[in-house]
Amino acid sequence: MAAFPPVPDQRQVDAFWAAFQAATGHDGAPAAVYPFGDSVDLAEELLALILAGRKQATADLAMFYEVEGETVPKPGDHAIVLDGAGRPRCVIRTTDVDIVPYGDVTAEFAAAEGEGDLSLDYWRRAHWDYYTRWLEPRGLTMRQDYPIVCERFVLIWAAAAPPG
C-alpha cells in the first residue's frame, strides 16, 4: 500500500504553479499543497468531484491544523490540490471559512461538499467515520462538539492532464 498522503515532486508543483500564474496572471505563492481525503482512492474521488464542479466545500477538524502544524485557510487563499499519486491537478481559492461544532454543520454546507447523496445525514456519517480514522490513532474519540473548519472554495484553474 502506498503511503498517504503522497509526497509531491516539488519540481512538478513549481512547474504547475508557474503554468497557473502564466495562465491567470496571479501573483504570489500557494497557501497550501495537498490531496483531499485520507487515502489514494478518496483523494481521486474527491478530486473528480472538484473538477466536475460538484464539490465546492470541505471540512476538517479544527484540531487537525494545530496538530499537523497547518494554517487554517482564509478567504483569498489559493491551494494546489493533488491527486492520489501526489501530482498537482488544480487550484482552488477559499471564499469563506466558518468554524462551527460538528453538530451544527448545516444541510446547505453538507450539500456544497458534493459528496454522496448531498444530504446532511450522509455528510454526518461519512465525516464522523473520516474524523474517527484521524482521531483514534491519537487516543481521541469523536464528539459532537468538536470544532469543524468549514471551508468554501471555487475551482479557478485545472491542468489539462496530470503532469509527468
Question: What are the residue ranges of the model-derived segments?
Answer:
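Mixed-charge, low-complexity intrinsically disordered regions
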Residues: M1-V91, V97-G164
